[in-house]
Amino acid sequence: MLDPNLLRNELDAVAVKLARRGFKLDLDLLRSQEERRKVLQVETETLQAERNSRSKSIGAAKARGEDIEPLRREVNELGDKLDTAKAALDQLQAEIRDYALAIPNLPDDEVPDGKDDSDNLEVSRWGEPRQYDFAVRDHVDLGEMAGGLDFAAAVKLTGSRFVVMKGQIARMHRALSQFMLDLHTEQHGYQETYVPYLVNHATLFGTGQLPKFGEDLFHTKPLEEESDSSNYALIPTAEVPLTNLVRDEILEEESLPLKMTAHTPCFRAEAGSYGRDTRGLIRMHQFDKVEMVQIVRPEDSMTTLEELTGHAEKVLQLLNLPYRKMLLCTGDMGAGSCKTYDLEVWLPAQDTYREISSCSNMWDYQARRMQARCRSKTEKKPRLVHTLNGSGLAVGRTLVAVLENYQQADGRIQVPEVLRPYMGGLEYIG
């Protein structure tokens, strides 16, 4: 969420920045709420001071032998008025907070304006798409030819947008995740972390999935039910538990950056995506991903975004998969991001680039919700950290890219050299 001081003191400037994202800030509502808050705050403080003063008078009057009943009645009346004023202030502050939670992050000045992905800016390309002298097959046909992708079995077990992987395809899927983890931990300085796949509502609130995006999650209980200790949701990404590890913590600045990576399944309801990418592994309810998260000092976050994106790029480069780097426009960024790069890998069967990684600087948007702070040795007051996250990479989509880019005329798949140590030295599968 945004800094409340910005909404109080720089409202017009905030409105201009949010308008770039297509978000219309209700200035009249916010100004009226703030004026009402000030009035109630003064009223509450005045009543509190007056009641305290009258309460002290009771003891003095009693010592003088005076009748204290009128004072008691007055104190009780002031207490009732104070309770009413406090309740009104609490209600108003809850309304202010609810509205603030729906406000997206402010876009960085470098982010291009735009409405959707057609307005994203291509920053760079790496690698050249291969040329084939045979009819290119897509990953579904290749996987089924190898006996490794079974969508019919998944439909029987669960439903659509799931898959059963078998044999060498399943092995390659596992090899990819192990390769990614080894790269990030051994060369990029991340600490491998194992996290729960079920998280509570406080955790989902911390990274911004709740309250706005609850319909995109799989819940153990209906979201409408009152939250308790048994209300969980399956994680949509390891970003959620990894980032929340610093919730309500004050970190020593000398310990930053904190770099974490995790390989987890991810679960998404894909609300609103009906009819999109219905064939294959591109859009699934359950998919694996290796996630990278960094917790950094505020002044380091923009440099860190470039570094983190580079770590995701390195995976694609070592796999020799052509890709392009896109700077997302204001209309295509996630609500909590101030700047996002997408990496899009070349898929021969689709003759286009498709997203395989998204790397974002969340600024202090998540940290404020989580109250995640850091403190230096020279400053007594802690300050909010900045949080960043990125896919390093989506394992299923990487498998898609390997199957399609490394296919042979006879339907076999050449195993990328960097994966061969993870696959017993195999050079081809299928």
Curated annotation (Swiss-Prot):
Gene3D superfamilies: Bira Bifunctional Protein, Domain 2 (3.30.930.10), Serine-tRNA synthetase, tRNA binding domain (1.10.287.40). Its EC number is 6.1.1.11. Pathway: Aminoacyl-tRNA biosynthesis; selenocysteinyl-tRNA(Sec) biosynthesis; L-seryl-tRNA(Sec) from L-serine and tRNA(Sec): step 1/1. Pfam families: Seryl_tRNA_N, tRNA-synt_2b. This is Serine--tRNA ligase. GO terms for molecular function: ATP binding; serine-tRNA ligase activity. InterPro entries: aa-tRNA-synt_IIb, aa-tRNA-synth_II, aa-tRNA-synth_II/BPL/LPL, Ser-tRNA-ligase_type_1, Ser-tRNA-synth_1_N, SerRS_1_N_sf, SerRS_core, tRNA-bd_arm. Keywords: Aminoacyl-tRNA synthetase, ATP-binding, Cytoplasm, Ligase, Nucleotide-binding, Protein biosynthesis. Homodimer. The tRNA molecule binds across the dimer. NCBIfam families: serS. ATP binds at R268, A269, E270, E355, I356, S357, S358. It catalyses: tRNA(Ser) + L-serine + ATP = L-seryl-tRNA(Ser) + AMP + diphosphate + H(+); tRNA(Sec) + L-serine + ATP = L-seryl-tRNA(Sec) + AMP + diphosphate + H(+). Catalyzes the attachment of serine to tRNA(Ser). Is also able to aminoacylate tRNA(Sec) with serine, to form the misacylated tRNA L-seryl-tRNA(Sec), which will be further converted into selenocysteinyl-tRNA(Sec). The gene is serS. One of its GO terms (biological process) is selenocysteine biosynthetic process. PANTHER family: SERINE--TRNA LIGASE, SERYL-TRNA SYNTHETASE.
